[in-house]
Each structure stands twice: as C-alpha cells, then as structure tokens.
C-alpha cells in the first residue's frame, strides 16, 4: 500500500510539493505562537525584573520569610521549632522553585533583652539603655571587612559576648571601641539604682563596613545596619539562645533566586510555591510574613503573556484563513485530478473507506514531513518577528531567548488536525461520486456554492451590521484590549467585496465583449470569450490575489499608523528630547493682598530655590538649547461671574526658547507654533485656551479669564488674569483629557482645559514656581552620553525623561514586536502561497487547454498571438485583481484602522490619531506582485514553448 501511495504522489509531484509547503507553513505558523510568546514573554519578564532593581534597588529574585517565633503559642523550644521548619519547609521550597539559589541569608533577632552602659554620665541620674535587641546573620563575616578593631570570636570568652557595629551605628550609639556593656533580661532592671550583679558582659571589639557595597547580598536588607548590634551567629544560637530560649524573637530567611534563569513556563509554579510557603508559615503564626520582590511583577506578567498570545492569534487568523483556502485549493486539484480513478474504483465496488485509506496515508506522510520541518521553520519565523521594527522592516536586534519545549508538540498536533480536516473535506465530497455520475456532472454547468448561497452579500451584510454597532461604541471600547472580531471582520470584509467583484466581473467582461463585438482582434476576441465563461480556478486565483494585495496594504497601513502614532505620542507627551524634573525645596513667605471681593487675604508666595538651576545645563556641551516650563493646576477659572468647574492645567512657557526646544508636529496645529509664540512675546497677559472651554462657557477671542491657585495644603497662592488670544486643541505634553475616577461609576475621563501663557507673567502673579527643564541635545549626542555627563558633573535631579529612549523601549516591547512581526509575516506568507497558487493555476491552465491552443493554431493564429492572448488573460485576471486589491485594501484601511487604534490607544493620549500611509510600503508590495506576475508569465511562455506544436496543431485540425 505504501509503495502505491508513494508512486501516486510521484506521478503528481508538483501538487503534492505545494501541499507539503502548505502543511509546513500551517505547522510553522501555529508553532511560532508558543515559541514567540515564550521568548517575548521571558524577555518582558526579565526586563521588568531588572527594572525593579533600577527603580527600588531591591534584589528582584528575593523571597523573604519572616517567622515571629515569640508570637507562636504552641509549646516547645523556640530554636528547635525554627530548625524543624527550616529543614522541612524552607529547604523543600528552595528545591521546588526550580531556580538556582545565588544568595542565602538567615537573620535572627532577640527580644526580652536590654543593653545598658556600665557607667553613668555626670549629667544623668540613670544608666543609659543602648538597645533592646541583638542581631546575628549566618556567614555575615564573609561579606564585611573590619576597619577598626577586630572580628568577634566564634565563642564567648571569659563570660563576655563580643559584638561589632557598622560605622554608621558606631557614630550614633554612645559607646566606644573596647567598652563593655550589660545585657540583661527585660524587666529585671530599668537602669535605676545599683546595677544587678548577674548580667552578661557585652564587649564592642570591632567596627565594620561592607566588603563590596555593590554586591547583591546587601540588597537583601531587612535590618537597619545603622542601629544593629551584631553578634556571632554561632554564639547566639549555640550558647545564648540555649541558655535563654525565650530571647529568640524573629527569624528571617532571605533567599535570592537567580531571576535571570526564570522561564515563562515556570511562572505559575513559582507563584504557587510562593503562596504555599506563605500558607505553611501562616498556619504556624498568623503574624508571619512571606513576601517576594517579584510577586506583583509575575502577576502582571501572566496578564501580559495572555494578552500577547491572544494578540498573535488575532493577527495570525487572516493568514491561517488564507492557508486553509490554499490547502483546500491544492487538495481539491489533487482530488479532481484523481476523479476518474476514484470514480473507477467506486464503480468496481470499492467502499468509501477503501478510497479514504489512500488519502489518509497521504495525509500521514505529509503530516510527518510537516512535523519534522514545521517547528524548525517556526524558530526562523520567531527570529524574524523578533527583529521586526515595522512592516517589512528589520533591524539587527539581539535574538529573543527562544527554546523548543513540550508545548510545541501540542500546537504542532493542532496544526496537523487543521491540515487533516482541510484536506479530507474535498476527498469526502468526491469519494461519493461514481463514474456515471462523474460523467453526468462534467456535462452540467452549475453555479459555485458561494454564488448559489449569495455568501458574498451575506458576508458584507454581517460586516456592515457589526461595523455600524462597533463604530457607535467607540467611546466605550477606547483603551480596551484588542477585539478579535475587529481583525476577523476586516478579513471577512475583504473576502466579501472580493467575492462580490468576482460575481459581477464576468458580466463586465461580457459587456465589454458586446460593445466591441465586431471590432475585436482574434486574440482579444478569444481572451474575452474565455474570461466571460470564467471557471472556478480563475475565480479562486483572483480571490487569492485580491486578498493578498488587500491584506498586505491593510497590514502595511496598520503597522505604519500604529508605529508612527505611538512614536509621535511619546514625543508629544514628553514635549522635548529631554525633560528634567529638578529637586525642589520651598521656603514660604506670606503677604497680605486683596482678593476678588476687595478683602484683605493672607497669601503664600513660595520661593523654590533648591535645584532647578538651568544654568548648570546651559554650560553642558551636549546641550544645544534649554527652556523652562511650568505647569500648575488652578483652583478655579472664572469667566465674568461664571465659574468653569472642569479640570484644567496652566502651562507657563518662555516663548523664544520654547520654540527652539519643544517638539511640535505641524499636522496637529492649524498654523505654525511660531504664530502662537509671537503673540505671547508681544502680549504678556496673552493665553491660548482649549477649544473645549466653549462647551462650558460662551467665550470668544478677546475675553478675559480669572484663574485662582491653591497649593497642595489648600493655601491660597494668588490670582492671574489672562486674555484669550486663540484656541488650541493640542499642545506639547498637555492632554485634552485626564483620568479622574469617582465612586458614582461616572465616566472617569474628564475634559482638561489647557491654558498656555507666559512663564514670566505667571511668576509675576504667583511668585517663583517650580518648573521642569526641557533640553534639546546637541547634534550627534546620545541619551546615554548626556546622562553620563550630568552624573559626572553631579547635577542633581528628581527625574529625567528621554523621548528617544522611551521610543526604543516601546519598539522593543514584546507586544509591539509581535504586532509588527506578525503583520510582516502574514503578508510574506500570503504572498508566498499566492505565488505558488498562481504558478499552479497557469501550469494546469496551459496543460488543460492544449486542445484550445491547437484549434487556435489550426485556425491560423501564430504562436506569438497565442502568447499575447495569454498575456491579455493574465492582465485581465491578475492585473485587475491587483487593482481591485489595492482599492479594497485602501477602503478597508480607512474603515477599520481608526477603530483598531481606538482599542489600543489611551483616552488621555496627547497626540491625536492620524492615518499614515507610506509610498515605500506600497512600492514593496508592488515589487512582490511584479515577481508573482513575471513568474506566471515566464511559466506561460515556457509551457507553450515546451508543447509539441505539431501534435497540438494536428489535434486541433482533427
């Protein structure tokens, strides 16, 4: 049986090779989902964990278990209970986590103890208490160095306990090196009267400092080294706590796991084990505490991973649909080619199962090849996705940490299931037909299924209804996650219009044919006559090309629009290349002035002076220009006697320098920003106000606004009166809306009235205010170079933002890379299968029309005229399909991309949505199409030249 199957596949090897390619692509695409999501998710996770270290200074892989032994009510020796819990639970927890332990720190503190100085100071009546506890850390000696004195001994000497202090603790505690103090049971003595005779001598023998302050060991810091009195861990556990067991207060296990080794599939296990340890310790002592620096990050990661996988499935769905159609087409061609054989077997008594077995073996062989090659191709696909920075744009980015895992097998099997169903459907349809029925059906002309069922009209009606409802609810969907139906409906819309065009296209050809019936040349006549009787194969290839072009254009426009809007929103939100937020400290003065009603009012005139010296930045060679920008939230805005109760933001700028530094897109302002700045220069009290203000008050240019301010302590700052000189909708770093949720389930996004005025006028009205410093870098200077210079000059700042760095971070985000990569990949795969389908069509077309060519040659047509006829056919089929694909792609982009952007954008974004279409993207698409058309034409010419013309002509004459 296997020999027969292989021989059968060899006899029709071209179609089977095409089918194998389809199966491999399906497997590779589906396998790329878990491969990419695992690599991208792991990358996101590691970056987020590193951010913890940068933002907080904490070690990202730390788990802290706090065991308050003194609060435990059960009987037994406290230290024994601790050792038992550590042996049974802590060690098992480390193993179950599945990560290398690179840091391990165990700390113990005492309670019920007091440390007193042995001598009284002259000014004191009582003995001074220094501390109420001792600390010990296992292997602490390996991470410190003694700067004065010596290290404590690992055993008590002469009945005294040796301790050490950090340099900071030594400067704070009133004790000298070599001095002895008394350690007593709490409650036995309170420092009054004579010192008890029975006490433990504690001697300070050394001062220490960190051996390597940059060591992650010091990030696992639970105790305050500036106060802690450190004793030998061995002495405390083996001597002191055995003699005084109730002195044991708390034990801290601080475990530093190698967070760089965390893989995506370990996240659920890690969180489960962490929660299990928390429960185990809670069951012992309710006041226990188990925390992890990565807990919140891992929780958010699971959400991000689900969103990433979901997004990739959404983006890949149009490609999968095209692949399914492609496999259906090829498998149908194979079955049609075998139809005479199937009918013969059926007529000779073969059962449906006998016929199915042949094709099942074929499916098994093809699936085996796909399983072997598909996952490897999936790896290559993931590499391509990871290096994508836009539509058909790639950069030399560091490869994602992608590994083949067990999950891939399940996805690969799903792919084979899809392939099996797709291929078996045509077999089931044709296996029911006998030889007599086959001959009868061959003579009948019957409309295709989708034409009989009017699927094109049904699909368009569904898409129209969905689009209408979705567009009506754009306010509700803004900022929500991607809707899978959005991509599906866009693809269905393309299919619907494509099918509708294919339905009416033959009628258009007939109309053209009738108009010039007596004028057409023989080649044109033969072409139009053939196309007016267009069959399923021509319709299928036209639909393929229409979908390929339309989806390519939609993908290109979508990627270009999303990427450009995202980048420009970062620029607009930041306002400039670099924004520095200085460190401020205010010294307040109070003055008495008259308020709006003429009453004497005490107002606060703040004078912020510490930090914010822009001259420090002006002196840097790496900075070309700087400007100061002030933003304040006013208490109220008055128009005559009417108060506008809407959130608002006042921005004070220096017009001349602002124009040199600020990033402004001319597309979002009705006139050049210089027009606005010139007015501010000419008129000190001029202001530009959001056009939104017209919805709350009847104001026009020339009207005045009175704006009052209060600080965070609700103290009155002052009043400013400005004249409206124009209205704006967008301004650098200011948003039209702000997020202000309430308890009444109202819309949390409120209008924000933007007011832009002169910084000098604002400070004259309110006093010296805090400001941010906006910088424009000198040509060729990178963000890191500027930051290094600021650090080198020791210029203090509270926060610094780089627009370019934010853009790079956004582009390397796993979700954005996935979107760009899948859009690019989708187009490449569609173009590839369209090329294969196109080649198959022309190969079968030439092979099946040998008789027609013979008749035409016998009638006197030259070979050149036959080639021209086929060229016209290609133009009328492929050329028109390309044109219609471009039109449909443009229409779909205009309709669906704004809706898509609504779902991924934020209501409070500064930059307005704009559609961006690049000619370069279209040129790339056209280049691929030209390759397809030239391939088809070369096959036509090659096929005709290979024909045995003498036999063809003789056949035509007969």
Role assignments for model-derived ranges:
Residues 476, 480-487, 491, 496-675, ...:
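Juxtamembrane segments of multi-pass membrane proteins
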Residues 12, 325-367, 433-449, 836-878:
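Interfacial "coupling" helices/loops that link adjacent transmembrane helices in transporter permeases
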Residues 2-323, 333, 387-395, 405-408, ...:
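Membrane transport/envelope proteins' first extracytoplasmic loop
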Residues 397-398, 431-448, 907, 943-958:
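Short cytosolic juxtamembrane segments of multi-pass membrane proteins
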Residues 375-409, 465-486, 816-822, 883-951:
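Short helix-loop junctions at transmembrane helix boundaries
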Residues 14-32, 36, 269-284, 303-320, ...:
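Alpha-helical transmembrane segments, especially those used as permease/efflux helices
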Residues 771, 796-889, 893-898, 908-912, ...:
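C-terminal transmembrane helical bundles of large multi-pass transporters
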Residues 334, 356-376, 412-416, 452-453, ...:
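Selective transmembrane-helix segments that form parts of the transport pathway or gating/packing helices
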